[in-house]
A protein has these predicted regions:
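Hydrophobic anchor at the beta1->P-loop junction of P-loop NTPases
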Residues: 6
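P-loop (Walker A) phosphate-binding loop of NTP-binding proteins
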Residues: 9
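Walker A/P-loop
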Residues: 15
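ATP-binding Walker
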Residues: 12
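Small-molecule kinase domains that catalyze NTP-dependent phosphoryl transfer to phosphate-bearing small molecules
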Residues: 102-103, 130-133, 152-215
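ATP-dependent NMP and nucleoside kinases share a basic, alpha-helical "lid"
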Residues: 104-112, 117-153
Length: 215
């Protein structure tokens, strides 16, 4: 079973494309099995909500994000993290091992079930080191105005969007340098999903692209 990363800046449309790919029966037939997906960022969000030990470790770094009951205020946490690059790196170093473990479990489960492909959705595939374990990466991107519009619809303010974009500065360049295949998600949803499906067929059938995208 192959494992392919799906990375790109916030608001680019990664989740929409991943959903379309997992539902693409023609693609599954061509690849020879089911297409599974795991959202590494969602795994970490769940861990922050459900793991008291992780909550304590994060609160030690960001005391202002700790609520009286020990849970974390995600808004305060994000605000602090995206204002301080050093803090963001420390938080990522604390959490990414959990994502790596979840991805390994999903991969083993997929192999046991006979699945053909596991899609690993994450923004920071390169910086986290997760790309080293994958067979390739798709870079999903869209023009800034489209991404900003999607994020405003999610409830983020222009200031919050600016901070997150600053934290992800250079992401596209690093992904392309690492061999990621670019997917233009500024087109229609169907066109973007079709382009991503074609890229996966190429990666899975010929092995083209960097088998160690971080190398």
């Amino acid at each position: 079973m192959r494992a392919i990363g799906v990375a790109g800046p916030i608001g680019a449309g990664k989740s929409r494309i991943v959903k379309a790919l997992t539902e693409d029966r023609a693609l599954a037939r061509d690849l020879g099995g089911e297409i599974l997906a795991i959202d590494a960022d969602a795994v970490l969000r769940e861990a922050r909500q459900s793991s008291p030990s992780l909550q304590r470790e994060i609160a030690a770094l960001v005391p202002e994000a700790r609520r009286e009951d020990g849970s974390l205020d995600s808004t305060r946490l994000a605000s602090a993290a995206f204002e301080r690059p050093d803090l963001l790196r420390a938080l990522e170093a604390l959490q990414w091992p959990l994502a790596r473990e979840a991805i390994n479990l999903a991969r083993h489960a997929g192999e046991a079930s006979g699945a053909a492909l596991l899609l690993v959705e994450a923004i920071a595939l390169i910086d986290s080191g997760l790309a080293e374990t994958l067979d390739g990466v798709l870079l999903v991107d869209a023009p800034r105005e489209i991404r900003a519009s999607r994020l405003l619809d999610r409830g983020l303010t222009a200031e919050e969007i600016g901070r997150r974009e600053a934290a992800q500065s250079g992401l596209r360049t690093r992904l392309l340098a690492a061999g990621a295949i670019p997917i233009d998600a500024g087109r229609t949803a169907d066109e973007a999903a079709a382009a991503a499906a074609d890229a996966l067929r190429l990666l899975c059938s010929t092995g083209e692209g960097n088998s160690n995208p971080a190398g």
